[in-house]
């Protein structure tokens, strides 16, 4: 089909992602720094390329930051780039995480979890004295469930137990909006080509602040 001159692919500016509820019991007793370390560890464990290759299969690009690749900066240039004034933590991916999951990513995830107070056995799995049990909220679309199952397997590499909570669309939206979740499926397509359209949802009073920042 890609070789068909009548076939055209139109890109969208948006990001498919998983969101944490910052008020979840998952973070009870943790400092701000420890909670950040936990979230980073989860992100390092997820194999984005596998999801794109096996579930997406339509040429999506991996997300290594929330603002998508190609979004304008409002000054005639591209927002997501390394400059003299700012270099992304992962310079090669121009984002916050490597573009390819590796053994180093898994090992870094373990170290981050250790810094958050978790212990590991000799075989690299979470010790039974410090388990992580998390519920992932998603709607009942086949593709979304397949992505959740891939994430479940990835997190299981270090012993994180993720339960998938599948809800009908309207119930899913309400539960997520009310903050009745630990970890949830999210996605945002930009309404207009400016980073503020992606970033304003993290303001406390935003109607899209599903992560419950400042609440």
Protein language model regions, located:
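Short helices/loops that flank or line small-molecule/ion binding pockets
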Residues: 1-2, 37, 149-158, 170-181
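Extracellular/periplasmic solute-recognition and catalytic clefts
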Residues: 1-24, 49, 53-62, 190
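Extracytoplasmic/secreted cell-surface and envelope-processing proteins
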Residues: 18-19, 27-30, 144-146, 172-175, ...
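Acidic-aromatic pocket-rim loops
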Residues: 2, 8-14, 173-215
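General small-molecule cofactor/ligand-binding pocket signal
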Residues: 8, 135-137, 163-167
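Append "and occasionally in soluble cytosolic enzymes with long acidic Gly/Pro-rich linkers
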Residues: 33-153
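Extracytoplasmic/peripheral linker and loop segments enriched in polar/acidic and small residues
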Residues: 37-40, 44, 52-53, 98, ...
């Amino acid at each position: 089909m890609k070789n068909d001159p009548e076939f055209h692919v139109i890109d969208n500016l948006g990001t498919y992602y998983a969101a944490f509820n910052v008020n979840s019991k998952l973070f009870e007793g943790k400092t701000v720094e420890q909670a950040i370390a936990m979230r980073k560890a989860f992100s390092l464990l997820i194999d984005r390329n596998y999801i794109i290759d096996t579930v997406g299969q339509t040429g999506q690009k991996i997300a290594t930051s929330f603002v998508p690749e190609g979004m304008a900066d409002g000054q005639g240039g591209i927002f997501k780039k390394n400059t003299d004034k700012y270099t992304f933590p992962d310079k090669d991916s121009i984002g916050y995480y490597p573009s390819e999951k590796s053994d180093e990513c898994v090992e870094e995830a373990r170290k981050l979890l250790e810094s958050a107070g978790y212990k590991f056995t000799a075989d690299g799995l979470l010790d039974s004295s410090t388990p992580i049990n998390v519920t992932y909220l998603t709607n009942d679309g086949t593709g979304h469930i397949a992505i959740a199952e891939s994430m479940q397997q990835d997190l299981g590499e270090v012993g994180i137990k993720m339960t998938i909570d599948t809800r009908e669309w309207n119930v899913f939206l309400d539960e997520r909006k009310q903050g009745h979740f630990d970890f949830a499926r999210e996605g945002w397509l930009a309404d207009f080509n400016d980073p503020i359209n992606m970033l304003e949802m993290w303001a406390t009073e935003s109607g899209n602040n599903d992560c419950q920042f400042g609440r």
